[in-house]
From Swiss-Prot:
Protein name, per record: Serine/threonine-protein kinase Nek4
Annotated source species: Arabidopsis thaliana (Mouse-ear cress)
Entry keywords, A to Z: ATP-binding, Kinase, Nucleotide-binding, Serine/threonine-protein kinase, Transferase
Residues involved in ATP binding: I10, G11, K12, G13, S14, F15, G16, S17, A18, K33
SMART domains the record matches: S_TKc
GN (gene name): NEK4
């Protein structure tokens, strides 16, 4: 527990509480789930320990990330899992205020949930509590299935008979006290998809007996007609009364209606877009990444058809995520070829026309669609490009000799078009809400103008022949150049050890912060004050210098 800093309590229930914590070294937010053991039944204690052991073995991109777990003083089971900023699906439906989600979004969520359930069922794990409040969303609106408190590892007969779960999501065989298996999770998923589409649960009643009757007789309102017949048919197939007639997660993933969305989900898995650079690297991680890249390059040279997934690509967090499987094959083997046949010719023509532009590294301004297509067709782009130029993966922003060393990432940071500040400070140049006049002089200055400015500052211009320049007056243009050079020299000569200059800069920082606060621009204010942490390197001097530059540039 000493490795984490408690931020706030985000949930509380009869068995424990959920706390938002921050890892002190990683500076990353997690959720600490504390399950109380005192004054609980033996079954509840066993369930808590089982959840801790079970979730530590689960590794899937669409299941909540497991970080750590321990038993605290014999009174609490503590489980640290990944924090999903998007909240749960129940809150997402409430925030929609009756506005239906697009079918494309629902299909993407369905595919991600099916991949999570297929992974669990293939490992003989029953979730047994699939409901909207246990489906979480990341900041990018991706699914994470959580809460394994009622999960169970199946026995050899693949059936269980315990009556657990939420009544509104219980399958008919469970209510009839008939042994059930993985098809019970499919029923619960069908109820969730119905609720996502209709913004209300399929079976709802004021008392339990009426609810059971509605479930047994399948009494529910029709799914909104705005969705296609194929999509509505998928949901209805998951809500069949006979479990033998319900499709499995593997069979649903092979449905023709979901194939395009499987391709989209897999391409997003294969090439995650990174918006930040890691500030710290360990030598061990760098060595492993370098070996993996070297092995992957050798495999691709021997066999150009080798995909990133077969070579074992990793996400930006550094942990390998298992490739979703269905029908005995990897998703890449089933779907990527279909998309490639449709739009390869168009991409090859564009690559030939823009071969020069493709070699220029781009950091911002690319759309998600372009980034995704570039990921799928990186093999084709390599064929039409110059064979002598160095190749790079699209998830990296720059072409470097050794992409996985600490020095190369510093080189990538230095080559970005950003203010001359420490790499530990926030990226002010990426904040679109700042006024344009702050960076106007810096972006428009060229090397020739800087040279003229330096000369004009070091040696005053000679007066024209026949004119008396004893009063020191110069033309308007020359005065402007001289003013720029003075500001530039002041920025270069700013001494952080000077108390007077530090006081002036701090005063400017307070004025600038007060201005942001008055305009209710809290995001920019938070980014401006973020460098003042004790763990940063020269953060105060860097922030003072940067604020003084802003103040002088706005004069």
């Amino acid at each position: 527990m000493e490795r984490y800093e408690v931020l706030e309590q985000i949930g509380k229930g009869s068995f424990g509480s959920a706390l938002l914590v921050r890892h002190k070294q990683e500076r990353k937010k997690y959720v600490l789930k504390k399950i109380r053991l005192a004054r609980q039944s033996d079954r509840a204690r066993r369930s808590a320990h089982q959840e801790m052991e079970l979730i530590s073995t689960v590794r899937n991109p669409f299941v909540v990330e497991y970080k750590d777990s321990w038993v605290e003083k014999g009174c609490y089971v503590c489980i640290v899992i990944g924090y999903c900023q998007g909240g749960d699906m129940t809150d997402t439906i409430k925030r929609a205020c009756g506005v239906h989600f697009p079918e494309e979004k629902l299909c993407q969520w369905l595919v991600q949930l099916l991949m999570a359930l297929d992974y669990l069922h293939s490992n003989h794990i029953l979730h047994r509590d699939v409901k909207c409040s246990n489906i979480f969303l990341t900041k990018e609106q991706d699914i994470r299935l959580g809460d394994f408190g009622l999960a169970k590892i199946l026995t050899s007969d693949d059936l269980t008979s315990s009556v657990v779960g939420t009544p509104s999501y219980m399958c008919p065989e469970l209510l009839a006290d008939i042994p059930y298996g993985s098809k019970s999770d499919i029923w619960s998923l069908g109820c969730c998809m119905y609720e996502m589409a209709a913004h209300k649960p399929p079976f709802k009643a004021s008392d339990v007996q009426t609810l059971i009757t509605k479930i047994h007789k399948l009494i529910m309102d029709p799914i909104p007609a705005m969705y296609s017949g194929s999509f509505r048919g998928l949901i209805k197939s998951m809500l069949r009364k006979n479990p033998e007639l319900r499709p499995s997660a593997n069979e649903l993933l092979n449905h023709p209606h979901l194939q395009p969305y499987i391709s989209m989900v897999y391409m997003k898995l294969e090439s995650p877009r990174r918006s930040t650079f890691p500030l710290q690297f360990s030598e061990r991680d760098a060595t492993l990444k370098e070996r993996r890249r070297s092995s992957f390059s050798n495999d691709r040279r021997l066999n150009p058809s080798v995909s990133d997934t077969e070579a074992g690509s990793v996400s930006s967090s550094g942990k390998a995520s298992p490739t979703p499987m269905f029908n005995g094959r990897k998703v890449s083997e089933v779907t990527v070829g279909v998309v490639r046949e449709e739009i390869v010719p168009q991409r090859q023509e564009e690559a030939k026309k823009q071969s020069g532009a493709a070699r220029t590294p781009r950091v911002a301004g690319t759309s998600a669609k372009a980034s995704t297509q570039r990921t799928v067709f990186k093999h084709e782009l390599m064929k039409v490009s110059n064979p002598t130029e160095r190749r790079r993966r699209v998830s990296l922003p720059l072409v470097v000799e050794n992409p996985y060393t600490y020095e190369s990432d510093i080189t990538a940071l230095c080559s970005l078009n950003s203010p001359d500040v420490s790499v530990n400070t926030p990226r002010f140049d990426k904040i679109a809400e700042f006024p344009e006049d702050i960076f106007q002089n810096q972006n428009r200055e060229t090397a020739s103008r800087r040279e003229v400015a330096r000369h004009s500052f070091s040696s005053p211009p000679c007066p024209p022949h026949g004119e008396d320049n004893s009063n020191g007056s110069i033309t308007k243009d020359k005065c402007t150049v001289q003013k720029r050079s003075v500001s530039e020299v002041k920025q270069r000569r700013f001494d952080t050890s000077s108390y007077q200059q530090r006081a002036e800069a701090l005063e400017g920082l307070l004025e600038f912060s007060a201005k942001l606060l008055q305009q209710e621009r809290y995001d920019e204010l938070g980014v401006l004050l973020k460098p003042f942490g004790a763990e940063r390197v020269s953060s105060r001097e860097t922030a003072i210098w940067l604020t003084k530059s802003f103040k002088e540039a706005s004069v």
